[in-house]
Amino acid sequence: MLSPKKTKYRKQFKGRIHGTAKGGFTLNFGSYGLKSMEPERITARQIEAARRAITRQMKRQGRVWIRVFPDVPVTGKPAEVRMGSGKGSVEYWAARVHPGRIMFEIDGVPDDVAREALRLGAAKLPVKTRIVTRIDAAVEHA
């Protein structure tokens, strides 16, 4: 699973996800992409589950690019532990995803296979998504 090799600090504040994506909202690598339509924290496990679903549907043909990286440590305290005594330990890593962010890109497979693969990948994610293509992206930003 994805996680940073090294961080400046071990724990972070929770933070909020305000506004739309300031970058990463256009297709840069593949012909098809999966775009987030709402703000959410996506865990490393969810990213990996979506990646596996996409590659399985593509039957290991073509190429998949993961455009989000889980760099936010999420902490938690064990069950039935009293409040206080400091912040809990890091339990998992998450990525903050803004609306409009391209999360996955694929290329090298037919149109129907690409759309089905991204649909199955989207089912593993906790956000509403939209499948975008190179043609759609060109029309949007023209």
From Swiss-Prot:
Quaternary data: Part of the 50S ribosomal subunit.
Matching SUPFAM superfamilies: Ribosomal protein L16p/L10e
Protein name: Large ribosomal subunit protein uL16
Gene Ontology MF terms in the entry: rRNA binding; structural constituent of ribosome; tRNA binding
GO biological process: translation
Source organism: Phenylobacterium zucineum (strain HLK1)
Top-level taxon in the UniProt lineage: Bacteria
Biological role: Binds 23S rRNA and is also seen to make contacts with the A and possibly P site tRNAs.
Name of the gene encoding the protein in the UniProt record: rplP
Similarity comment: family membership: Belongs to the universal ribosomal protein uL16 family.
